[in-house]
A protein has these predicted regions:
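Short, small-residue-biased leader/transition segments that mark boundaries at the very start
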Residues: 3-8
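ALDH superfamily catalytic-core signature
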Residues: 103, 136-194
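Conserved small-residue-rich beta-alpha loop and adjacent elements
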Residues: 34-103, 149, 171
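Residue-level signal for inorganic ion chemistry
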Residues: 16, 77, 108, 129, ...
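A structured beta-alpha segment of the ubiquitous adenosine-cofactor-binding alpha/beta core
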Residues: 42-44, 110-127
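Short beta->alpha connector loops at strand-helix junctions that form conserved
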Residues: 78, 83-85, 112, 132-133, ...
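Short gly/ser/thr-rich secondary-structure transition/capping motifs
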Residues: 32-39, 110-113, 176-177
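Short, structured beta/alpha segment
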Residues: 1, 18, 25-32, 171
Length: 194
């Protein structure tokens, strides 16, 4: 139970709290240096929403890796299409019910299904794509996004290296590595240096 709270509830609530605390600063217009050739002008960066964001989440953290990017997308003023993993159908259905209860479909839409639905979504034009999954899926997402010059954030699976330096406290490092490796039934990626 504590693992579930730590892996899902605490992290999502923490993301919401952080965003509420820092959103004003993140949305502010920032003064930036003006090129010398345009010395009489003033230059600014003005944050603006991407538009419609596709969020594709994995099976190993289906709730967390759907809601965390969704919090950020909503805070930035975007609409979102959420595609939970077909390999976590109970979580996907719960997310669909929850999000449909909280948001109108033109603001946050949830698409359930497998590879066929993924392929259909990737044929559509989105203004930003956030995808967590395998390297193979990441390549497909990147290829589809390239057709529309859509910016992409990929979090790809891989190895789980740990580097333990000579100066480390071996017992503490071992406990942390075991904890990190076996949290969420072992479907956790970690890359630590201790």
């Amino acid at each position: 139970r504590r693992q579930r709270q730590m892996c899902i509830r605490d992290r999502v609530q923490g993301e919401i709290r952080w965003m509420k605390q820092h959103l004003g600063r993140l949305c502010r217009q920032k003064h930036v240096r003006t090129p010398l050739a345009q010395f009489a002008a003033k230059s600014y960066q003005s944050p603006s929403p991407y538009g419609n964001v596709l969020i594709m989440s994995p099976w190993n953290y289906p709730v967390l890796l759907t809601l965390e990017p969704l919090v950020d997308a909503i805070a930035a003023g975007n609409t979102a299409v959420v595609k939970p993993s077909a390999y976590a159908p109970v979580s996907a259905n719960v997310l669909k019910d929850l999000l449909e209860e909280c948001f109108p479909p033109e603001y946050v839409a949830v698409v359930l299904g497998g590879r066929e639905e993924n392929q259909a979504l990737l044929q559509e034009k989105f203004d930003k794509i956030f995808s967590t999954g395998s390297v193979a899926v990441g390549k497909q997402v990147m290829e589809s996004a390239a057709r529309h010059l859509t910016p992409v954030t990929l979090e790809l699976g891989g190895k789980s290296p740990c580097i333990v330096e000579k100066s480390s406290k071996i017992r503490l490092a071992a406990r942390r590595i075991v904890f990190g490796k076996f949290i969420n039934c072992g479907s956790n990626l970690l890359c630590w240096i201790t």
